[in-house]
């Protein structure tokens, strides 16, 4: 048998296995939400409709955020352009029930996995505001050109948080005074101080012009 053919077959099989393991999990199923009548990929649990409804609200807020960003900045802000291009509702799903898995985004939005349950035996759904803080964190990764939690990322996260608060898509909380349990960990701080919210509401260009005087 031709060695090149064998290598080709092995490569194809490896790709199929990779796609199966990364895109499919028997613990996740598509469930129709009673809120938006759309299908959402969530864990197959007794409260799966509630989970689907939670994801319907997450996606609604995300769409509203992107829409308002575009309305406010048009095509004048590169960060907004990047987020609008990368964000897609259909790429969001619930995390599989693994002990060490929380939330993450893959390849800048190709897949956005969100943990929405407690890690104890109850597996209770998390409140929407706490989940949105985490979701906005992931959207900041989509907005950021570089990789990791660097200065660019944290500035973009503050920018997103400030506007989400302004547009009532997220309610500011003091996690230092009152930590919030989330997915087996605790959220103990926010990168955005309340006093700094106003300066992130204006455009990046306007902020830079202020610093020149």
Residue spans for each PLM region:
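Active-site-proximal or metal-binding-adjacent scaffold patches in catalytic folds
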Residues: 1-132, 142-213
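Walker B catalytic acidic pair
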Residues: 138
């Amino acid at each position: 048998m031709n060695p090149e053919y064998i290598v080709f077959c092995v490569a194809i099989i490896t790709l199929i296995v990779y796609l199966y393991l990364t895109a499919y999990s028997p613990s996740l199923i598509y469930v129709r939400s009673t809120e938006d009548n759309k299908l959402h990929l969530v864990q197959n649990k007794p409260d799966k409709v509630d989970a689907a409804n939670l994801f319907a609200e997450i996606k609604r807020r995300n769409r509203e955020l992107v829409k308002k960003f575009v309305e406010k900045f048009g095509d004048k802000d590169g960060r907004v352009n990047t987020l609008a291009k990368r964000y897609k509702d259909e790429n969001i799903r619930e995390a599989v029930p693994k002990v060490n898995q929380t939330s993450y985004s893959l390849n800048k939005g190709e897949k956005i996995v969100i943990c929405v349950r407690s890690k104890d035996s109850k597996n209770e759904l998390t409140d929407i505001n706490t989940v949105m803080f985490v979701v906005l964190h992931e959207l900041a990764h989509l907005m950021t050109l570089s990789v990791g939690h660097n200065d660019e990322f944290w500035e973009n996260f503050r920018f997103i948080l400030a506007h989400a608060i302004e547009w009532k898509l997220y309610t500011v909380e003091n996690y230092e005074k009152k930590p919030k349990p989330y997915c087996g960990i605790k959220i103990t701080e926010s990168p955005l101080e309340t006093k700094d919210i106003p300066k992130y509401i204006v455009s990046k260009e306007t902020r830079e012009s202020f610093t020149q005087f």
